[in-house]
Amino acid sequence: MTLDNLPTDTPARISAVDWSQLVEEEARRLRALGLDVGAVVRVEHRGVLFGRDPLAIRIGRMMVALRRVHACAMSVEALVEVGA
């Protein structure tokens, strides 16, 4: 599943990123924010207009607004929370 399809409030680990879908400068910035393979993320909110863009993504203690086109390049695996 890709990050743009991850249900809201579901923790997931980024399992792969197709960097070829992104402009080099955008890819560099996303890596600098920690959005790379192995990072644990959670979709907190989606936009309400224009294709539900952008997505509010939590990574650690940081909240990042991410365009859907960028989220489409990231494959994720949902994590099972302890006690769930």
Segments predicted by a language model, with ranges:
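Short, basic/aromatic beta-hairpin or loop at an interaction surface
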Residues: 7-21
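Short, compositionally biased
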Residues: 31-32, 53-66
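Glycine- and charge-enriched low-complexity intrinsically disordered segments
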Residues: 68-84
